[in-house]
């Protein structure tokens, strides 16, 4: 186990393209930190720099008490798990799991013991003699995890390990990976573009956008207090509603002169962006917001009402036992649930 520290780490490619702006953060010993963001945001580049697969242009990277900028990947005592499993098809499960230890010169008895221990954790004992082609996608991913576990690394690096699995298996493996990481207590960095994975698995989340860190925080901090409109719209399903508004004398209004309840923008006059999550508002004849419902989406446990507030797209999440119809209605908003952002840069006010 080890603490990971990045100090002003930057990545610039030879053509001058900046993949990652100078970035600094610390992952405490034993924590699972998730790097999340859209394609091209720099999350995989950052992970590859920690792994030693990408050269660091500027800055300093430490794993434990060692600065590892110039240390080869094989000597960093890390273990990676990829989305494509990277298993040898001609080897058995046991041989795949123990291959790295064999290359280190460990004796057969010790390798066998470590493989058996990892197989116990991952429920793979009955599959140790099988080839990868005889396994399901979830079982192959467990083998890849077992291969990482037997190395007893200071740091696990997960690069979108669940992307090739179907939705049901992703949910199952998400729980298994989190439980396993907690059991082992090994520091972990986990890359994903899926905000659900980030929210459900992380001790802390690092949200990246266009090579820049937008926000670092716990899942609750990210969700309850997004630092920007990007974070607000990217984290959460369905995403936060963002409306153009106007602030004057502390009050906030939308188009048509609609006042936004529970919103105060003291010290800020002019254009503003108003954020309200779909689950923080509900149909109420005595409500303050006029809402025109165009489409109702049935999701089983809840309904999503899609329409417009002040001529702008807006969605509302309601429980399945609440009736809803298309057309005009009023909405109430949960006190303290209105988020205000700068209209130009999108930063939280």
From Swiss-Prot:
ATP binds at residues 37-44. Gene3D superfamilies: 2.40.50.100, Nucleic acid-binding proteins, P-loop containing nucleotide triphosphate hydrolases. GO terms for molecular function: ABC-type glycerol-3-phosphate transporter activity; ATP binding; ATP hydrolysis activity. Its EC number is 7.6.2.10. Keywords: ATP-binding, Cell inner membrane, Cell membrane, Membrane, Nucleotide-binding, Sugar transport, Translocase, Transport. Residues 4-235 form the ABC transporter domain. It comes from the Bacteria. Its main location: membrane. Pfam families: ABC_tran, OB_MalK. SUPFAM superfamilies: MOP-like (SSF50331), P-loop containing nucleoside triphosphate hydrolases (SSF52540). One of its GO terms (biological process) is glycerophosphodiester transmembrane transport. It is an enzyme of class 7 (translocase). The complex is composed of two ATP-binding proteins (UgpC), two transmembrane proteins (UgpA and UgpE) and a solute-binding protein (UgpB). Belongs to the ABC transporter superfamily. sn-glycerol-3-phosphate importer (TC 3.A.1.1.3) family. This is sn-glycerol-3-phosphate import ATP-binding protein UgpC. The gene is ugpC.
